[in-house]
Structure formats: C-alpha cells, structure tokens
C-alpha cells in the first residue's frame, strides 16, 4: 500500500468541519435514515446502519440526533435518496471521486459540475477515475487510548485479519479488505481497543502531488464539494505534503 495517510488529512480538516457541524450532522442523519429505511433499525443486524452510526459517533454527533434519524426511518416518511457517484480531475490532474446521497439527481449533478468548473477541475464520465481507487476498510486507534506498542499492535492487526498497519506519533491506521472489514473491526474491539474511526472508504492506488501553484484552487474545489448539501464523501488521490 502507498502509505497514503487518511488520518493526517482527517485531522487537518477537523477545525473546518467543526465550523460546519450543523451541515455535517444533517448529512449524517440522511445516511442513517437511508440505512435504517433499507435494512431495518437495529445496527447489530444492519451492517450499513452500523457503519453510518459509527461514522456519526466519530463526528461527535449527539445520540439524540442518531436516534431521531432512525425513528424517522421507522415512521411513515416517504423521503428517498439515491446514491450517486461523480468522477473527475482536480487542478493538477489529481483524480477525485465524489459520493452523494440526493433526492434530486439533476440538482446535484449541476452543483457538482459547477464546483469542478469554477475551481479549475473537470468532471469526467462514469468510470473515468473509479478504477484508480480501491474500496477498503479503514480503522484508526488513537495511541493515547492504548498501551500497545507497535509490535503488539501489528500482531493483533494481523491476527484480526488486517492487511496493513501504518503508525504515527498519535495514531495507528489499519487498512483491510472491504469484505473482511467487519470481522477485523469486531476482532479489534473484542481485543479491547477503542476505535476512533471505523469505516469503508476509497483508497487511491497511487497518489499525485498537487503543484504548488494549484494547491489553493485544489483546496477550494474540495471545500466546494464538501459544502454541497448532497455530497457525502469526497476522495482524492492527492499526495500528502510529507510524501
């Protein structure tokens, strides 16, 4: 694996997300609602809902908000959202994937297209960049919550079935095959680890450095996409600055 660190990016964007907390919770509520609507209200029997709830908890979404979204799905609400993926290139030729949950595909497609166009990117056709990413399980353990050293952590990750362990001063990052993610997550929790993040994500097979003269425009594009009410996730193949 490339050594691409999602945790570095997550931490780097945390303050910006905190400022948009209301919008983040609204998006998470939508994900929880659709997961519960399609697979039932019990996270233990609904893997998609478990993922949505874990994601909400990682974002410090209040328990009442989570329960409200599940209750709404159990009720008579006829709201429906479609999952849509958009693909393209950011400034500097960096591949970018956008996942959305929308009740109006035309509106969302238009908004995403405008974001790309206004910020130096180009929206591509379906399949234009998706093949450059792999679906992976992603787990983060904050090192302040465990006494395990790197050797112990590696042993436990391998025993649980994880594919890759990356370490930094503040966190252990674990990547798994998408199909084995649930088993790895459950095994690590059973071993007593507290998981700061546990999710399915898209990981680039290779990363591309963002040219210095394109960095500001690149960040504006990502911000514009993440600000869209319908956009759930934005994945890029941008190399970390330290790579």
UniProtKB/Swiss-Prot annotation:
Keyword Manganese: no
Main location: cytoplasm
Any one Gene Ontology molecular-function term assigned to this protein's record: DNA binding
Any GO CC annotation of this UniProt entry: cytosol
Transmembrane segments: none
Classification via InterPro entries: Integrase-like_N, TACO1_YebC-like_2nd/3rd_dom, TACO1_YebC_N, Transcrip_reg_TACO1-like, Transcrip_reg_TACO1-like_dom3, YebC-like
UniProt keyword Endoplasmic reticulum, yes or no: no
Annotated compartments: Cytoplasm
Positions of region (Disordered): 1-22
Keywords tagged on the record: Cytoplasm, DNA-binding, Transcription, Transcription regulation
GO biological process: regulation of DNA-templated transcription
Family affiliation: Belongs to the TACO1 family.
Protein name, entry field: Probable transcriptional regulatory protein Ldb0677
Organism: Lactobacillus delbrueckii subsp. bulgaricus (strain ATCC 11842 / DSM 20081 / BCRC 10696 / JCM 1002 / NBRC 13953 / NCIMB 11778 / NCTC 12712 / WDCM 00102 / Lb 14)
């Amino acid at each position: 694996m490339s050594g691409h660190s999602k945790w570095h990016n997550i931490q780097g964007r945390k303050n910006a997300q905190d400022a948009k907390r209301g919008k983040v919770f609204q998006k998470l509520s939508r994900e929880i609602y659709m997961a519960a609507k399609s697979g039932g209200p019990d996270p233990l029997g609904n893997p998609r809902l478990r993922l949505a709830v874990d994601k909400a908890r990682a974002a410090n979404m209040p328990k009442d908000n989570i329960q409200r979204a599940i209750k709404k799905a159990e009720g008579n609400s006829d709201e429906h959202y479609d999952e849509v993926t958009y693909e393209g290139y950011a400034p500097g030729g960096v591949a970018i994937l956008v996942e959305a949950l929308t009740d109006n595909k035309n509106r969302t497609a238009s908004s995403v297209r405008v974001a790309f166009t206004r910020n130096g990117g180009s929206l591509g056709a379906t399949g234009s960049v998706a093949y450059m990413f792999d679906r992976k399980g992603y787990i983060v353990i904050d090192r302040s919550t465990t006494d395990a050293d790197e050797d112990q952590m590696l042993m436990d990750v391998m025993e649980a079935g994880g594919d890759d362990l990356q370490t930094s001063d503040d966190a252990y990052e674990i990547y798994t095959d998408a199909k084995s993610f649930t088993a790895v997550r459950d095994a690590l929790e059973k071993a007593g680890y507290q998981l700061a993040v546990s999710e399915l994500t898209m990981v680039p097979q290779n990363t591309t450095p963002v040219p210095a003269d394109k960095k500001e425009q690149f960040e504006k594009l990502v911000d514009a996409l993440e600000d869209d009410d319908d956009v759930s996730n934005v994945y890029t193949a941008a190399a970390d600055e330290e790579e």
